[in-house]
Amino acid sequence: MSCLRIQAWWVWLAVGLLAGLAIGGLVPDTPLHAFATDRVDNIALATGPVDWQEGIEAMYFLDFDTGSLKAAVVSNATKGFQAYYAVNIRADLMAAAQRAGVQLPSQPRYMMVTGLVDIRRGGASQKLPARGAIYVAEANTGIVLVYVIPWSPQAHASNQPVVDSLVLWASDRF
């Protein structure tokens, strides 16, 4: 009797494993994307996608004191960075605050995260909006600025150095 229970247990385990494998084979794979953000004192650092289909990401660096937002993309051919992007967010933040009718504090408090975006990309242009965005929020006012990298897949593929500005894609108060 005890021997039959042990054998039945193995049979059910085998049936369950086979059923799980069969169902798992029918369900399409779901890609997972992980990005990182960290801060210390008045500096924030984040990683985010540029062209996630190609596995390319950028490093973003925000200096809270100066409002300087910089991004860099690692070269795929040599050691070092291949592309650099920068913008000072203060002018964009001031313009968004004026539109929202709010006063900016003397000491802005920033938060920064990255994410995937689905922006229409025309094929004719050399520079396309990246597939990722950097979101910078000012915590006192609720204003969020969204920046994208003007991405050139051709420049990256040929390891051509790039120095350009980040593009303000959207801004609003929440």
Q: What is the predicted function of each stretch?
A:
Residues 1-11:
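N-terminal positive-inside, membrane-proximal cytosolic segments immediately preceding the first
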Residues 6-8, 171-174:
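N-terminal low-complexity/intrinsically disordered pre-sequences and tails
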Residues 9-25:
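Hydrophobic membrane-insertion alpha-helices, especially the h-region
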Residues 24-35, 76-113:
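A low-complexity, Ser/Thr/Gly/Pro-enriched, surface-exposed linker/loop concept
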Residues 38-66, 117-141:
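Short, low-complexity cationic-aromatic patches
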Residues 45, 59, 70-72, 112, ...:
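A compositionally biased, intrinsically disordered/low-complexity signal enriched
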Residues 64-94, 140-172:
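Extended intrinsically disordered, low-complexity coil regions enriched in Ser, Thr, Gly, Ala
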Residues 93-143, 149:
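Short, solvent-exposed interaction modules
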